[in-house]
Every structure is written in structure tokens, then in C-alpha cells.
UniProtKB/Swiss-Prot annotation:
Organism placement in taxonomy: Archaea, Thermoproteota, Thermoprotei, Thermofilales, Thermofilaceae
Protein name per UniProt: Large ribosomal subunit protein uL22
Organism (species): Thermofilum pendens (strain DSM 2475 / Hrk 5)
Keyword Ligase part of the UniProt annotation: no
Function field: This protein binds specifically to 23S rRNA. It makes multiple contacts with different domains of the 23S rRNA in the assembled 50S subunit and ribosome.
Gene3D superfamilies per record: Ribosomal protein L22/L17 (3.90.470.10)
Length: 151
């Protein structure tokens, strides 16, 4: 069994952690969405992700934005990563439950660390004409979030 670690170790008595491992969703859109919710409270992050899942708010793309159309609610290119938002909402629920278990005040938590890491690639094949086959890959993603209690 592999052991999972977090890429950052913060003070354990004032922080709550949660992670998703080997999730099939877009790595690039996950990075952009995590950039949007970092530094926010859990309730504010939940509201933002719910709006993204309902396609009422788009995620501004800062890094992975080649050939992407502009959106009216953000300055510049943006997308609506619904699958990413739904998975991150589950992760926020997990983070909140972990904080309650540790006895932290959930209203005073701020997301101080949010990171996505590339996981394993799953190779599949698409049959083509004349007996050929084309491989295509599914990139899995690891996500970790750490929230700290702020006075």
C-alpha cells in the first residue's frame, strides 16, 4: 500500500487537511480552480464552487489559456469546469468534517494551501480502420487542501 503525504507541513493543532487521490478530472482546470479558491473561507469557496457547478460563474484561466474564448464575467479567457467543481465540493465537505473532528471553529478557517498533482495515466485504445489502433490517455489527479484557523 502506498503512503500519501502532503507537500506542505503546517502547524497540526490549528490546521485541517483533506485530499483526493486518483480522481479522473482535468489537471489543468483543477489547478486554475484551486487558484480561485485559495485564501478564501470554506463557506465562500463552497459558494464559488456551487456557482461554477451550476455554470453561473466561470473560472478565469491564467496559465492554461491558449485558444480559449473570453467570458463576460471574467476579464479574459475562462471555462466552466463542472466536473472539477463537483469533486472539489466533496473535498470541501471532507475538509469541514475533519476540522470539526479536530475541534476547530469552521467559521474561522481559511484555505492556506491548495495544490493539484498529476497522478497515474491510464492508457486506452481507440480502434481505427485497417486494423490499427490509436492510444489515448486519461490523466488522474491528486488534490490536497489545508485550512488554518484564523482569529
Amino acid at each position: 500500500m502506498p503512503t500519501w503525504r502532503y507537500s506542505v507541513e503546517l502547524e497540526p493543532e490549528r490546521t485541517a487537511k483533506a485530499s483526493l487521490r486518483d480522481v479522473s478530472m482535468s489537471y489543468k482546470l483543477t489547478v486554475e480552480t484551486l487558484r480561485l479558491i485559495k485564501g478564501k473561507s470554506i463557506e465562500e469557496a463552497r459558494r464559488i464552487l456551487t456557482e461554477i457547478a451550476e455554470m453561473k460563474r466561470s473560472v478565469p484561466l491564467k496559465r492554461y489559456n491558449k485558444k480559449v474564448g473570453h467570458r463576460s464575467d471574467v476579464p479574459g479567457p475562462g471555462r466552466y469546469p463542472v466536473k472539477v467543481a463537483k469533486n472539489l465540493l466533496k473535498l470541501l465537505d471532507n475538509l469541514e468534517n475533519n476540522a470539526e473532528f479536530k475541534g476547530l471553529n469552521v467559521e474561522n478557517l481559511r484555505i492556506v494551501h491548495a495544490a493539484a498533482h498529476k497522478g497515474m495515466k491510464i492508457r486506452n485504445y481507440l480502434p481505427r480502420a485497417f486494423g490499427r489502433a490509436t492510444p489515448y490517455y486519461d490523466q488522474l489527479v491528486h488534490v490536497e487542501i489545508i485550512a488554518r484557523e484564523v482569529e
